[in-house]
Amino acid sequence: MDLRDYIASIPDYPEKGIVFRDISPLMANGDAYREATKQIVDYAKEKRIDMVVGPEARGFIVGCPVAYELGVGFAPVRKKGKLPRETIEVTYDLEYGSDTLTLHKDAITPGQRVLICDDLLATGGTIKATIELVEQLGGIVVGCAFLIELMDLHGRDKIDGYDIVTLMEY
């Protein structure tokens, strides 16, 4: 199965000159969604994962079924003010401005082996911040899994030294 058949490419969205890669068709097709999940699970099995972490919102869509299949928990990374209990936070730069991601202080225990899942690796800012959150709590990031990598944006360079798998490249 070619998962690219289930990615919609929308030109000039959200602004002119950008091609948005929409994973909605993949999620809407049970076979494609299951295949994407299986490929990430197969990657993760040998890593002895204790916890899956995913940044909002599409990291939840990718990470939750992976955690379920691996029989481990899932910890959500959210924007500031969205998690109800005590959190840690990391602020990172965007193209115009900055953003802050948070994680519950008790989401990861020291030494836990963590897989981070998200839909897209673009500039690398979100994944770098997510790694920092996990490591602040003593977690060990043993892998980062993405449905899509946008090669021209070189996000992989920001997380050099981490094991990365992407199912599709554009």
From Swiss-Prot:
Name by which UniProt lists this protein: Adenine phosphoribosyltransferase
Subunit relationships: Homodimer.
Catalytic activity reported: AMP + diphosphate = 5-phospho-alpha-D-ribose 1-diphosphate + adenine
GO CC entries: cytoplasm
GO biological process: adenine salvage; AMP salvage; purine ribonucleoside salvage
Pathway annotation: Purine metabolism; AMP biosynthesis via salvage pathway; AMP from adenine: step 1/1
InterPro entries with a match to the protein in the record: Ade_phspho_trans, PRibTrfase_dom, PRTase-like, UPRTase/APRTase
Main subcellular location: cytoplasm
A UniProt-annotated Pfam family: Pribosyltran
GO MF term list: adenine binding; adenine phosphoribosyltransferase activity; AMP binding
Location in the cell: Cytoplasm
Source species, domain of life: Bacteria
Job of this protein: Catalyzes a salvage reaction resulting in the formation of AMP, that is energically less costly than de novo synthesis.
Record EC number: 2.4.2.7
SUPFAM superfamilies, A to Z: PRTase-like
This protein's UniProt keywords: Cytoplasm, Glycosyltransferase, Purine salvage, Transferase
NCBIfam families: apt (TIGR01090), PRK02304.1-2 (NF002633), PRK02304.1-3 (NF002634), PRK02304.1-5 (NF002636)
Entry annotated with the keyword Cytoplasm: yes
Organism of origin: Enterococcus faecalis (strain ATCC 700802 / V583)
Family statement drawn from the similarity comment of this UniProt entry: Belongs to the purine/pyrimidine phosphoribosyltransferase family.
Lineage: Bacteria, Bacillati, Bacillota, Bacilli, Lactobacillales
